[in-house]
């Protein structure tokens, strides 16, 4: 009988594939997890027990950093957020929703603008101009596929788990297929009637990339922000949080308070108007406890 630690890299039909120092072990979880209403997730660090006959059982889930998405990925270090230039159309509202959600989850984000080859001229230039603002406030931004192919593997450090996320049909699985040639994820066509992608990824797996792992998750076009506390929302807009230290009042919500540094920077054009408008819209959404109409 021996114990080994590893990372859950796949889940299929009740079996867990766990990467250990000795290689990948396919195992099942002990019934105690059902009793505790716990379920191991892809990305979990776990302990497995291997008996003298070579049978193995997952016996312990080690403490998690986080657990994101459905199906879930645990211990996510970084999000590679794929936003399309077209098909589906580029959306600052959707971009801000993703960034706010992952900021709330305390996960760093790198932005990749996909399908730039399908859009030319002034429209593409305007999108890149908008994204330059996000780069200025601290988000790494890629608009060229070849840069992503070369630099993302270099950015994934030892033991890190990066997760692809973004709107349906933005090209996450296509990107993964290029980054990891044996990924074999199914890529699907766009559902033109809804201007959304078909949900083509049906499971979550981790693939070795760089010194860590990359996961693909099912595409989704909406994020539920209603669990966020209203008075904390402003903390998840990174430039608002930085500016708030100069606000006159502690806990300033950047609405009509006097001496608000965020409103001052907004008037000076140093904070993007669209970001502030999205902040106000999210406040309304959270206070009313419902998704906006365009996401229903």
Swiss-Prot record:
GO terms for cellular component: cytoplasm. The keyword Metal-binding applies. It holds the Pfam family RsgA_N. One of its GO terms (molecular function) is GTP binding. One of several proteins that assist in the late maturation steps of the functional core of the 30S ribosomal subunit. Helps release RbfA from mature subunits. May play a role in the assembly of ribosomal proteins into the subunit. Circularly permuted GTPase that catalyzes slow GTP hydrolysis, GTPase activity is stimulated by the 30S ribosomal subunit. Monomer. Associates with 30S ribosomal subunit, binds 16S rRNA. Zn(2+) binds at residues 247, 252, 254, 260. Its main location: cytoplasm. It is an enzyme of class 3 (hydrolase). GTP binds at residues 114-117, 166-174. InterPro entries: G_CP_dom, NA-bd_OB-fold, P-loop_NTPase, Ribosome_biogen_GTPase_RsgA, RsgA_GTPase_dom, RsgA_N. Binds 1 zinc ion per subunit. This is Small ribosomal subunit biogenesis GTPase RsgA. Belongs to the TRAFAC class YlqF/YawG GTPase family. RsgA subfamily. Keywords: Cytoplasm, GTP-binding, Hydrolase, Metal-binding, Nucleotide-binding, Ribosome biogenesis, RNA-binding, rRNA-binding, Zinc. The gene is rsgA. Its EC number is 3.6.1.-. GO terms for biological process: ribosomal small subunit biogenesis.
């Amino acid at each position: 009988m021996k114990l080994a630690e590893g990372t859950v890299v796949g889940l299929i039909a009740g079996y867990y594939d766990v990467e250990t120092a000795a290689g990948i072990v396919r195992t099942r979880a002990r019934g105690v997890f059902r009793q505790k209403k716990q379920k191991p997730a892809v990305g979990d660090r776990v302990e497995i027990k291997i008996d003298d006959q070579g049978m193995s059982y997952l016996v312990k889930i080690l403490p998690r950093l986080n657990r994101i998405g459905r199906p879930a990925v645990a211990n996510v270090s970084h999000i590679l957020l794929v936003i399309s230039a077209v098909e589906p159309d580029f959306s600052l509202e959707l971009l801000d929703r993703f960034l706010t959600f992952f900021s709330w989850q305390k996960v760093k984000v790198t932005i990749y603008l996909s399908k730039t080859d399908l859009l030319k001229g002034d429209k593409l230039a305007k999108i890149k101009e908008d994204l330059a603002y996000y780069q200025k406030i601290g988000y790494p931004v890629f608009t060229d596929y070849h840069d992503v192919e070369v630099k993302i593997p270099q950015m994934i450090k030892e033991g890190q788990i990066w997760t692809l996320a973004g709107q349906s049909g933005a090209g996450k699985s296509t990107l993964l297929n290029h980054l990891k040639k044996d990924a074999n994820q199914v890529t699907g066509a766009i559902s033109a009637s809804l201007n959304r992608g078909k949900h083509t990824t049906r499971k979550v797996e981790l693939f070795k990339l760089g010194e860590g792992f990359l996961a693909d998750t099912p595409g989704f076009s909406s994020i539920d922000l209603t669990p966020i506390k209203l008075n904390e929302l402003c903390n998840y807009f990174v430039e608002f949080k930085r500016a708030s230290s100069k606000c006159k009042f502690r806990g300033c919500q950047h609405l009509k308070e006097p001496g608000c540094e965020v409103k001052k920077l907004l008037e000076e054009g140093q904070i993007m108007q669209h970001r502030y408008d999205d902040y106000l819209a999210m406040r309304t959404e959270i206070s009313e406890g419902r998704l906006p109409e365009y996401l229903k």
